[in-house]
Amino acid sequence: MVETYAFLDPGSNTSFCTDQLTERLGATRMKTTLSLTTTSHKDAKSQSLVVCLEISDPCGNHTIELPNVFSRPSLPVTIDDIPRQTDVDRWAYLNGIHIPHIDAEIELLVGNDATKVLEPKEIRESKDGVPSTVRTLFG
């Protein structure tokens, strides 16, 4: 088992992980060609590895299989994108939300191909332009 942060991205139709994560897990990888469309490129072909991953929440209460996760050298998010407890504590309407801290990078991007992972369980709506938040099975 490896601990990492996951970026839940409903704007992506595919899930991705870092090459480094697949290596640390010793995951079985299969070569494939990936067609990526972004705001700056359309149908850009790229060699990738596809893996099957099983993810669980920090307490191990919920586990879901992600059957087609594409491996990339890096993901378009950084450690600075990870919310911290001090961020949440700034707003009273977010009271009761606990963000666990782990010593890890963001090595998994979960797209809308994993709808159960993205499914909202609780929504804290934005007030006066400050952040809103969504709780899922995974936090």
Map each language-model feature to its residues:
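Aspartic protease
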Residues: M1-G139
